[in-house]
Design a protein with these regions (language model features):
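Gly/Ser-rich oxyanion-binding loop with an adjacent helix/lid
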Residues: 1-85
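C-terminal nucleotide
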Residues: 68-173
Length: 173
């Protein structure tokens, strides 16, 4: 992988998926599918490296290219988005800003914990199982039960999901 370490561009996920692919090739003849490689890589990140991440980075790294991922079902729906930026007169540039995300494990753990707390308030495991309108209509009690930051993160989650759908539609269209 040529992804810069600690850059916030899923360098650990890219590395884990690379190792999974190498081992799959050496011992299995490349029979393990991209989703399974991603799940294996996530397990490595969670257990071996002690980083409480979700599956998004590993799935995107394993499938490759530009993708949308819907984690609503247990078996994540992954869809490639074909886009030739150059043909449309654009270039996708990655810039090394010198930032380092290497020591943010506790911060990432807090995000997941707080979002799960909001979901648990409604008897669910993840926010994907809770409608935005439900969260919006219970903001007061959520603030008291989970805190302001958890509520803001939950609202940001819904905004991000809507933005991704809009961007995917724009790229396809």
């Amino acid at each position: 992988s040529s992804v810069l370490r600690g850059s916030g561009l899923s360098s650990s996920a890219a590395f884990e998926v690379l190792i999974a692919a190498i081992l799959d090739g050496l011992y299995n003849g490349f029979v393990v599918d991209a989703k399974t490689r991603a799940v294996i890589a996530q397990k490595v990140e969670n257990v071996y490296f002690g980083k409480p991440c979700g599956l998004m980075d590993q799935m995107a790294s394993s499938v490759g290219g530009m993708v949308t991922i819907d984690f609503k079902e247990q078996d994540a729906k992954v869809e490639a988005i074909a886009c030739d930026f150059a043909a449309k007169g654009y270039a996708l540039c990655v810039v090394n800003t010198g930032g380092d995300h290497g020591d943010l494990t506790d911060d990432y753990a807090a995000i997941r914990k707080e979002m799960e707390a909001v979901a648990a308030h409604f008897g669910k495991h993840v926010l994907r199982e809770v409608e935005l309108e439900t969260v919006e209509s219970h903001v007061g009690e959520l603030r008291r039960a989970c805190g302001d930051r958890a509520v803001l993160r939950a609202l940001h989650y819904y905004d991000e999901n809507a933005r991704v759908l809009e961007q995917a539609a724009a790229i396809r269209g």
